[in-house]
Regions:
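PLP-dependent class I/II
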Residues: 1-248
Length: 248
């Protein structure tokens, strides 16, 4: 929950692994929370994963969108996981190329070969234009990403400040990505029993779009995105506060 920044510990990971476990998925920085695991935490995870001999699939699409002068660490770089780590990335987030549909992965040769066989039958190949655009982004673009991340950090600071005095909600301060995962369960009632109902209320009555936390495994929260202008953030928070205030 928010009190532990929606993080798990190496001990919790070890306890969750059974003889049926084949892989775990790590998303850092995280969608929906924006929370990022530290190098020390990931190295502790790596020890557990190597001991269990299972795969780790590391979703690192937000690796470049990190704040407060922190640095992203890839669990795939831990030597003990050379044959167990599958790193997944893409150009959608860091380079704002969502519609180009380009992703990539790195991992053990046999795993990549199997994935390639499946991918070739499911989606065939990405468009050649998209491939060349992604190559240019990955090899030539740096300052533009830094400018974008700086803008996101300002928006993160703004939305956190605006929500700071909102009663009866809790959320972790994001380390990266561009989301807030806000626990709104104190506003639930017989009339508003869960995150889906609350998100529907905010959309239909106050015209702000949020994502119910049930989509991410926590029905107590809703996800907010600050991938928009500062003006929209200010107006959106006003509407959110008004919408929550109506619920008593």
């Amino acid at each position: 929950g928010p009190e532990k920044r929606y993080k798990i510990t190496a001990g919790q990971l070890r306890a969750a692994i059974t003889n049926r476990t084949r892989a775990i998925i790590i998303n850092s920085p995280s969608n929906p929370t924006g929370v990022m695991y530290s190098r020390e935490e990931l190295e502790e995870f790596a020890a557990v994963i190597a001991e269990a001999g299972i795969f780790v699939i590391s979703d690192e699409l937000y690796e470049k969108i990190v704040y407060d002068n922190n640095r992203h660490f890839s669990i795939g770089s831990v030597p003990s996981l050379a044959d167990l780590a599958i790193t997944v990335n893409g150009v959608s987030k860091a380079f704002s190329m969502t519609g180009w549909r380009i992703g990539y992965m790195r991992g053990p040769k046999d795993v990549i070969a199997a994935a390639a066989r499946m991918q070739s039958q499911v989606t065939s190949n990405p468009a050649s234009i998209s491939q060349m655009a992604a190559l240019s982004a990955l090899t030539q673009i740096t300052s533009e990403v830094d400018i974008m991340v700086s803008s996101f950090e300002k928006r993160r600071n703004l939305i956190v400040e605006l929500l700071h005095d909102t009663p009866r909600i809790t959320f972790p301060r994001p380390d990266g990505a561009f989301y807030l995962f806000v626990d709104v369960s104190d506003y639930f009632s017989d009339r508003m029993p869960n995150s889906v109902a609350l998100a529907k209320h905010l959309l239909e009555e106050h015209h702000i779009a949020t994502v119910p936390g049930s989509a991410f495994g926590d029905d107590n929260a809703i996800r907010l995105s600050y991938a928009c202008s500062e003006r929209d953030i200010i107006e959106g928070v006003k509407r959110l506060k008004r919408g929550l205030g109506e619920l008593g």
